[in-house]
Amino acid sequence: MKKILLTNDDGYHAKGIKALEQALENMAEIYVVAPKHEKSACSQCITITAPLRAEKIKGKEGRHYRIDDGTPSDCVYLAINELFKHVCFDLVISGINLGSNMGEDTIYSGTVAGAIEGTIQGVPSIAISQILSNKNKNTPLSFDLAQKIIQDLVQNVFTKGYPLKGRKLLNVNVPNCSLQEYKGERITPKGYRLYKKEVHKRTDPKNESYFWLGLHPLKWQKRENEDRLSDFDAIASNHASITPLNLDLTSYDDLKSLESWHEGMLK
């Protein structure tokens, strides 16, 4: 039977990872290793300055752990190299995240980082995120569409094989719409996210300042010379976006021009 490792950045008790497990439990043997607490926007952080403690969850056949103060990358690394080191995983899936992970947000994302860690460890990996109608994660939300999309995608992987070679992963974003309103999937590049220099300053009861970051609305623009719809465009039209991501961040187009710019300094 196929074996899938699940993680997330919203925490072990989050609704999204429970919905993900429910969607896949009849398709494969499911293992879950997730942070004990929310670790959103922690990116590829791994813990090397403090010990990690893994708590085995009772009643889950020894296949569920939550990691005290662990990040998604910690969880995947620990699962593959120690907790389940004798298990050969067919897939690592990170999600279902509460909120989008599109454009440059993928650099910040703990959800995407979980899938990146799976890729680094040599396991085909997928990150999946559910768009929210607002910033309130307690807003009632159906995962029916996200569950259907991940079921279809996993079945395709099991039938045809993983579609990417090398250190690459799939990043999936699901629109906030009903099954009836859904328009299908689109293969997309990352869009160009627009960020505002926005910091929310507050004062606590002791008259000390504190700050909230990252509360600006989702805005984007088209990349130059890009004919394809981006992940943002797909979501805006009630399509799911499926974006291949590459771990190689080298800007190959700039190597020769950089050599010319640096000419005379190279020894």
Swiss-Prot record:
The record's top EC class is hydrolase
Q: What cofactor does this protein call for?
A: a divalent metal cation
**UniProt keyword annotations, A-Z:** Cytoplasm, Hydrolase, Metal-binding, Nucleotide-binding
This protein's record includes keyword Metal-binding: yes
Q: What is its EC number?
A: 3.1.3.5
Q: Which organism is it from?
A: Helicobacter pylori (strain J99 / ATCC 700824) (Campylobacter pylori J99)
Give me the reactions it catalyses: a ribonucleoside 5'-phosphate + H2O = a ribonucleoside + phosphate
Give GO MF terms, alphabetically.
Answer: 3'-nucleotidase activity; 5'-nucleotidase activity; exopolyphosphatase activity; metal ion binding; nucleotide binding
Q: Which family does it belong to?
A: Belongs to the SurE nucleotidase family.
**Which GO CC terms are listed, alphabetically?**
cytoplasm
Per its record, how is this protein called by name? 5'-nucleotidase SurE
HAMAP family (alphabetical) = SurE (MF_00060)
The free-text note explaining how the cofactor binds reads: Binds 1 divalent metal cation per subunit.
Q: Where in the cell is it found?
A: Cytoplasm
Location (main, coarse): cytoplasm
What role is this protein assigned? Nucleotidase that shows phosphatase activity on nucleoside 5'-monophosphates.
The residues that the entry says bind a divalent metal cation are 9-10, 40, 97
Q: Which SUPFAM superfamilies match?
A: SurE-like (SSF64167)
Annotated signal sequence is none
